[in-house]
């Protein structure tokens, strides 16, 4: 959903 989709 986030524009910077990391696996955090």
UniProtKB/Swiss-Prot annotation:
Gene Ontology CC annotation, any one: extracellular region
Modified residues (Leucine amide): 8
Keywords: Amidation, Neuropeptide, Secreted
Protein source organism: Cydia pomonella
Record flagged with keyword Nucleus: no
GO BP terms in the entry: neuropeptide signaling pathway
Name this protein carries in UniProt: Cydiastatin-3
Subcellular location: Secreted
Family in the record: Belongs to the allatostatin family.
Main localization category: secreted
């Amino acid at each position: 959903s986030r524009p910077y989709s990391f696996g955090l």
